[in-house]
């Protein structure tokens, strides 16, 4: 019997699409199996690309998880940023309440991926924290300039509020109902910005 070796035909994709498909494959693996023991070969197989192709886009697992953190942060902040836009309609405190509820809901909906990407990240400040720090800082400064938030220092207030929201949302979403967590986070934020 004369069997010919099977050849695989790969679909040529634009670089941006190929990169996204690799990140999608890595996300599927992380959600299914976690990050422990994840290899470049696993990701290449899941993405249906040659290992060499994978290395054209990412040099290591750390490079892939860093890109996944960036993508996650951009998607989440892109979704939530309009809620705190300067000059937005409605009172700032109501907009902040809406922002916190949407943030808690998004974190709850994606908690497995969030946990996998950010819990053991070996970075000084992850892209999600940096993005929310900048977003809250602009919002607080805008409220201070309008006389709605009588805070003495927008930078320290931002740091305090960010740390408080992180603690309440991280702990609360694992221990209590989402509604209870949202109410606690909203109360904390209101007391911080408008005592």
Where do the language-model regions lie?
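Alpha-helical DNA-contacting segments of helix-turn-helix folds
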Residues: 65-72, 117
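Amphipathic alpha-helical packing segments from all-alpha helical-bundle domains
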Residues: 74-78, 98, 121-146, 155-159, ...
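Short hydrophobic/aromatic patch on the recognition helix
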Residues: 48-58
């Amino acid at each position: 019997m004369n069997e010919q070796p099977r050849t695989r035909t790969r679909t040529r994709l634009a670089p941006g699409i190929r990169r996204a498909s690799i990140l999608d494959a890595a996300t599927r693996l992380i959600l299914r199996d976690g990050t422990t023991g994840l290899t470049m070969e696993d990701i290449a197989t899941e993405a249906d690309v040659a290992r060499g192709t994978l290395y054209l886009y990412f040099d290591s697992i750390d490079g892939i998880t860093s890109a996944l953190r960036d993508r996650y942060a951009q998607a989440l902040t892109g979704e939530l940023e309009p809620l705190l836009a300067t000059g937005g309609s409605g009172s700032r405190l109501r907009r902040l309440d809406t922002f916190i509820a949407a943030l808690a809901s998004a974190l709850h909906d994606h908690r497995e991926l969030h946990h996998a990407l950010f819990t053991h990240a070996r970075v000084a400040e992850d892209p999600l924290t940096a993005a929310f720090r900048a977003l809250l800082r602009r919002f607080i400064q805008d409220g201070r300039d309008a006389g709605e938030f009588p805070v003495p220092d927008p930078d320290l207030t931002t740091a305090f509020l960010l740390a408080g929201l992180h603690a309440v949302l991280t702990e609360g979403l694992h221990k209590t109902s989402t509604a209870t967590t949202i109410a606690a986070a909203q109360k904390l934020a209101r007391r911080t910005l408008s005592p």
